[in-house]
Structures are given as C-alpha cells and as structure tokens.
Regions:
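Hydrophobic alpha-helical segments of multi-pass membrane transport proteins
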Residues: 142, 203-207, 347, 396-425, ...
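Membrane-interface loop-to-helix entry segments
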Residues: 137, 166-217, 274-277, 393-406, ...
Length: 485
C-alpha cells in the first residue's frame, strides 16, 4: 500500500525537477534584437538604481529606522547586493537568456524551482513598477505645488479614504506613457535612457555640493540612535530594518540581467554592466544620504517621498530645489522605463515557457513582447495608483532578496557544468565555494529583518504562485510537452 501511494509522489518529484535545455531558450530568444552595449546597460541600471531610491527613500528610512546612520544601511545593502551581483555576473555570462533568475534556475535546478524564483522576481519587478510610479507622482505633485497647481485630494495618493485619497492618477498615467514608449522598440528607449541618466547625475552632484553648505554637525548626533524597544527604530536593529527597505535600491542590476538576450556579446558586456552600475550607484547613495541627514534632523523626513527637494526648499535654495524636482521627475521616469522593460521580459519568459498563456511569449514586428508588456502595464497601473508608497517599498525588497538567494545558490549547480554542457564563464565569482554561501546567507539575514507584514504578504504571494503553477503551468509548460512527444 505504501509502495503504491509512494510511486505517484516519486514521479511528481521527478517531474518538478525536469530541467530546461538551454538551447531551447537560445532558439526562442533569437527573435529579440541584441542591441545593448555596456554603456546602455549601465544607463538602464543606473537609471533604476540612481533613479527612484536616491530621490525618495533616504529620508523615510532615516525617520523610521536608522536616524543619521542611513548611509550605513546603504553600505550594508551594497555589500549584500555586491555579493549577489558577482553571482549574477557569472550566471548571465554563461546563460544569456531573457528572464534572468527564472530562466537560469530552470536550467540549473529544474522547472519548479525556476518558477519559484521567477514568481519572486515578478513580485520584485511588478511591484517595483508601481513603487517607482508612486515616487514619481510624489515629486510631480511637489513640483506642481511649488507652481501653485494642486490636484484634487482624491487623486493624489493610494486608496486611503480616512485621509481623503482614493487613486494616484499621476502614477497611473506615468506607467501608461512608459508602456507606450517601450512598445516603440528597445533601441530608441536606450538612447533616451542614457541621455536622462547623464543629466540626472549632474544634478545629483549639484545637490551634494549645494546641500553640503547647509550641513549642521549637530544633526549627526547621535549617529546611531539607541534602539526603541518594540520598534524597528534605532541601534543595529534599525540599521538592519533600514537595509531591508533600502534593498529596493539595488533592483537595478537585477533588471539589467532580464535584458541579457538583447545584449551584444553578453558574456563580457553583462558583468561590466552589473558591476559598473553597483559601484556608481553606491557612491551616489552614500554621498546623498550623508548630505540629507546633515541638512535637517532625520525626524523631519517622516513620510516624505521627496526629501532632497524638500531639504533644498526649506534651506532657501528654491531654484536648485525646483531644478532637482524637474530632474527627479525625469530621472524617476527613466527608472520606470528600466523596470517596466525588465517586467515585460519576465512575463514574456513565462509565456515562452508555457507556464503562463503562450500568447504572452509572442514577439511583434518591432521585436517587442507586446502582449506581456501591456499586461504588466495595465496591472501595474492599478497597483501603483491604489497602494501607498512605503507599503510597496517593503514588498519589492522581499521579492528581490528571494531572487538573490536563488541566484547565489545557483552557482553551485552552474560551476560544475561550465566548459562541459554549458559555455565557460567569462567572469567567475571569486572564492568559490565559500562566497556563494555567504551571499545567500547575507540576503537571508536581511530578509529576516523585514517587518512581519511583508513576510506574511510574501507567503500569500507564493501561495498564489503555487496555485497557478499546479493548476496551469505544470501541464502547459514546454518541458511537459516535450516529454510527452
């Protein structure tokens, strides 16, 4: 009796671990045009990394978790992201497919684990689109307010009847405009992105220089406030909580990897783009956050999604503040381009593999997965216009960390196959086999620092993912169809 009941379970477990042939991905992704260079990847990554979080998160994290020590949270997050970036760099140089961690884990560990990694990525990307649009809306409203233009209260934020807001109309419009832009083709998008990033970095440097003249040393004392029992503020507990929330800043290099199939010579170009983005972004994060908490006491940044422009206005630098707001509006818009682009490529990969309806894997005459693009665009419009900014930030970090853990552990399955049934890596994660484990543990510790609501919501998210996989994906996937032939 036990042997009979055990046989179906054994077959199911074997089925869940079926691995995809990398040549199948190479053939299906050949319709995508490889046009991205190193500078384009750094532009896309920096557009995301130095696009949203740098303009929106430092003030909120300082007020809610770290106090003046917010630069330490960025440094800790950078270490964790840097370790993961090394794993991403090696994996993307061997497996240059669309879909990033989803496709890689499918090849390395099997379809079930690939779906779990991909579902975590979808939480990261999908919610990131809404988060970025929400931050863009906050800056746009601040800029319009400085000109005496104010939207009706009901249209200025997520669904919060107690405070009179029902829908963030500007967030929804921003997502729609970016969806239209991306639908025109990747080459035009990358040119626009590079130009915006160059302007944005110049204005951030201007903020650092001007803001540094308003720093008051007393605002740094105490640099690490004492921990408040029962909260996630102060002490190293606060820094860990701040690090978990800040991790959203580093989804930029993850978004780069989603575009591997559209990259020229990805074996060399992708590692350069990943590491270049991380180094550049971290330097700007530390400088901006140090200046920001030095200008005003950290508590004054509570619930402020446009802290840099606010600090300049309240220190008398109105012209610079307005210039920063304009560039932030444009710069965060560029981040929206990068993350919506990555989101559509992930949905395309799900459709390509049959785990979601195959129509999502269709590529049009402009070499764009248009069905996937418009699905994620309209869903993100709903999410970004209804949910509040800080709620979205925490959820994005949770999805990011799960993906980082999978890719770091994936090195153990990848390295033995390099130079055999997979190409030799052009870049290798150093100190193997120790560093991949350190990277995975680091991300797991930061995940543990997330608030309980984020963990509960992620459990719910994965429950939905498992239902979709067992109800649809398991039977309709291309792996299943190939084995039935």
């Amino acid at each position: 009796m036990c042997r009979i009941s055990g046989e179906p379970m054994k077959k199911l477990l074997e089925r869940l671990l079926w691995k995809q042939d990398p040549n199948v991905y190479m053939a299906k992704d050949s319709k995508l045009t490889p046009s991205l260079r190193t500078i384009d990847l750094i532009g896309l990554g920096t557009g995301m990394v130095v696009g949203t979080a740098i303009f929106t998160l430092p003030g909120i994290v300082a007020a809610e978790h770290t106090g003046p020590a917010v630069p330490l949270a960025f440094i800790v997050a950078a270490i964790g992201a840097g370790l993961s970036a090394l794993a991403y760099a090696e994996t993307s140089s061997v497996l240059p497919f669309a879909g990033s961690a989803f496709s890689w884990i499918n090849v390395l560990f099997g379809e079930f684990f690939g779906w779990i990694a991909g579902w975590a990525l979808l939480a990261e990307y999908f919610i990131s689109v809404a988060f970025v649009a929400s931050g863009w809306s906050a800056y746009m409203q601040g800029f319009l307010g400085s000109l005496g233009i104010r939207l009706p209260k009901a249209l200025t934020g997520g669904f919060d009847p107690a405070h009179g807001s029902y829908v963030d109309i500007l967030a929804a419009l921003a997502i729609l405009v970016v969806g239209i832009l991306i639908s025109q083709g990747l080459h035009q998008v990358s040119r626009i992105e590079n130009t915006i990033v160059a302007i944005k970095l110049l204005v951030i440097l201007m903020f650092i220089v001007v803001g540094a003249t308003e720093i008051q040393a007393k605002n740094y004392v105490p640099f690490i406030p004492p921990h408040r029992p029962g909260t996630t503020f102060g002490g190293w507990q606060g820094i860990l909580a701040g690090t978990a929330q800040i991790f959203i800043a580093y989804v930029g290099f993850d978004a780069i990897a989603a575009n591997t199939a559209e990259t020229r010579n990805p074996q060399k170009t992708m590692p350069r783009g990943l590491i270049g983005t991380l180094v550049l972004g971290t330097g700007f994060f530390i400088a901006v956050s140090l200046v920001l908490v030095g200008m005003f006491k950290y508590s004054r940044y509570a619930n402020n999604a446009e802290p840099a422009a606010w600090a300049l206005r309240h220190s008398g630098h109105y012209l610079t503040a307005n210039l920063l707001s304009v560039v932030a509006i444009i710069g965060i818009f560029s981040a929206l381009i990068a993350i919506l682009l990555a989101s559509s490529r992930l949905i395309y990969a799900f459709g390509r593999d049959g785990l979601l309806p195959k129509t999502l894997g269709v590529i049009n005459d402009q070499h764009v997965p248009s069905h996937a693009l418009w699905l994620i665009t309209f869903l993100a419009m709903i999410l970004g216009s209804v949910f509040p900014f800080t709620f979205l930030a925490t959820l994005v970090s949770a999805g990011t960390l799960v993906a980082f853990i999978f890719v770091s552990l994936g090195i153990y399955a990848l390295r033995p196959r390099e130079g055999k049934d997979l190409p030799e890596a052009q870049f290798k994660m150093p100190w193997y086999p120790v560093l991949p484990a350190v990277s995975a543990i680091f991300s797991a510790v930061i995940f543990w620092g997330l608030n309980i609501d984020a963990k509960i919501l992620m459990v719910g998210w994965f429950a939905i993912g498992l239902i979709i996989y067992f109800a649809y994906g398991l039977r309709h996937s291309i792996i299943n169809q190939e084995h039935q032939k």
